[in-house]
Amino acid sequence: MGKKWIVFFAYLLLSSFFISSSSAGITKESPLPIGQTLSSSNGFYELGFFNFNNSQNQYVGIWFKGIIPRVVVWVANREKPVTDSTANLAISNNGSLLLFNGKHGVAWSSGEALVSNGSRAELSDTGNLIVIDNFSGRTLWQSFDHLGDTMLPSSTLKYNLATGEKQVLSSWKSYTDPSVGDFVLQITPQVPTQVLVTKGSTPYYRSGPWAKTRFTGIPLMDDTFTGPVSVQQDTNGSGSLTYLNRNDRLQRTMLTSKGTQELSWHNGTDWVLNFVAPEHSCDYYGVCGPFGLCVKSVPPKCTCFKGFVPKLIEEWKRGNWTGGCVRRTELYCQGNSTGKYANVFHPVARIKPPDFYEFASFVNVEECQKSCLHNCSCLAFAYIDGIGCLMWNQDLMDAVQFSEGGELLSIRLARSELGGNKRKKAITASIVSLSLVVIIAFVAFCFWRYRVKHNADITTDASQVSWRNDLKPQDVPGLDFFDMHTIQTATNNFSISNKLGQGGFGPVYKGKLQDGKEIAVKRLSSSSGQGKEEFMNEIVLISKLQHKNLVRILGCCIEGEEKLLIYEFMLNNSLDTFLFDSRKRLEIDWPKRLDIIQGIARGIHYLHRDSHLKVIHRDLKVSNILLDEKMNPKISDFGLARMYQGTEYQDNTRRVVGTLGYMAPEYAWTGMFSEKSDIYSFGVLMLEIISGEKISRFSYGKEEKTLIAYAWESWCDTGGIDLLDKDVADSCRPLEVERCVQIGLLCVQHQPADRPNTLELLSMLTTTSDLPPPEQPTFVVHRRDDKSSSEDLITVNEMTKSVILGR
């Protein structure tokens, strides 16, 4: 009798084992309840219900089978645990996979499958949960398309700019809470791509650009390293990173709740950590700020690149380096200068390439360097094996210097920063004679300086009196006259740390007056070509333009050779700093972009029709649209004015000025300009705001289409909705987007007469009246990096000019 009971209990034990663990799939007739699991056929992975610390909250997940403690690699219901003991995972009538929380309904779903012939769910040998059509065998859904915090071999991170599809890793909130946490790991759509970890919208860590077999910011991945990843990018705006299994071991890559990326494998007993990042303090994004260099081998970890000094010296001394560095000697760049203001490149070895790089298709380092030298916006370049030429047109951010490995980065400096030193022996041997020469020279210099200053004071005083006398207060009511001392104090003596940017006429500085009012100071360079009459015209005429969508001039300063224009300060800088930044662009959703478009249109209408002067701007572009503290747009940079008698509405000039890509065809080719030239530029500006793409950088596929060409095809094919920046798709009204694309195309039509005037434009933007169909625009081919910068100014003397016509 005892033996029979033993046999009976053995039978029950074996039966319960086969019930609780099965390699069969989930079907409509055979759901997966709590207490039962589904295994992969190779026995490596298991799917089932689990909880933390014996909690009633149950999750459906996948884990490595037989490994203690359990390591969960995927969770279905991350945000919504089930609590009913009768919960189960089942196939629905339409073929989708559903998690039922007992009588509480559906807690999670794989989405609509719409399969009439039925489907089943299986766990593959790669740990991928797959829903399969019973009739065709087609995969209807898979967990690898909906990753959590872990990648398994054969899984993929990806992006597709055309469809907006993106596959990322998202961290858990904590070790025992699988809901979505603070960190996201993704590959960026840059060329070449890189791995980027963000905390919210803030960069936290990045791998550096991909170079055929390695990430350049990971020294471990040298030329001899065979990594566990494969990266693909194509010209259609899609890319992927696939995790490979090169040794048949159990392995995983994971984004932890603390934001670290960990690669590990199982040796049969324990998990072995192969790679973790960020690990060193230099791995954290931007720890040394713009133009700061984080050195891994020596303390203190942050230093400035050669030719740069700390921006906030006291903070720097305290170990707060995030303010970064600024140039010690300002660059004077005219493309290919060879004089005393010529620029040179200083090479820095063993560098993790900084962020915000741009790829340029040059075949050797010489061409790469030459192109960067001729592009005044290019601040640095690197020619990297497996990539080719990279250039930097923005601040060098998140640069790291390794003890070994890394890349050679060449940084643009003023020639004076690389001046050589005398040899110590030569200095010692000639110290007496040199001292004598210095003393004699100093005495001579003092005498000469006295004579020059004496004569200059007379000339300068007379010049200042003449200029100030010519500038009558009644001509410029409300305009303030500032003395040089006030402006020098406000701008910290034109400190480079106060520099906001470089315009066609000279640098622009931020200043703060004694009453606390912030200002922007345009310091007109002596080489800008401005004469007395032109300068007076700008002050007298532009000061009379008052509109909420125009930057307002507050005053001027004339002392000696200095000519300064003082404008109201714009807190949020220019529109391009938001629109073309992968993170800041999220701050301007579709409603805000539409407000900006309408505000710019109102400003142009005022210039063309509502002011007592008729003003044709001739250089409307995204960098000339400034944003105030409420993100209201203001048109800026009118440049030098020129007055015409009468009421002309068009003119012709031999001095074609403006920015390539924004200029109307008739203006660029013949010099003929009118208010319709500004309308064309506004149309280009609209397409940039809608798409989030630069007119000078956009390309689509192998055909190198312009943004205008792509917008035209988009409007013809889909009404223009697929032109929209995917980052703002959730906040848009599709009909508004399609209408704006059509208006933009109406503005860039080839014939000026076909383009709307500003009154018609405002009506189009603020009503729902019917729009005429646009004619196919001229697809002007834009120049790439091999010849020019991102913004090519077409001008005789490199000035950005507006034209002011009397009514």
UniProtKB/Swiss-Prot annotation:
Record-annotated active site: D619
Enzyme Commission number(s) of this protein: 2.7.11.1
Positions bound to ATP: L500, G501, Q502, G503, G504, F505, G506, P507, V508, K522
Annotated InterPro entries: Bulb-type_lectin_dom, Bulb-type_lectin_dom_sf, Kinase-like_dom_sf, Pan_app, Prot_kinase_dom, S-locus_recpt_kinase_C, S_locus_glycoprot_dom, Ser-Thr/Tyr_kinase_cat_dom
GO molecular function: ATP binding; calmodulin binding; carbohydrate binding; protein serine kinase activity; protein serine/threonine kinase activity; ubiquitin protein ligase binding
Modified residues annotated as Phosphothreonine in this record: T653
Residue intervals of the PAN domain: 333-413
Family: Belongs to the protein kinase superfamily. Ser/Thr protein kinase family.
Identification of the protein by name: G-type lectin S-receptor-like serine/threonine-protein kinase At1g61420
Lineage: Eukaryota, Viridiplantae, Streptophyta, Embryophyta, Tracheophyta
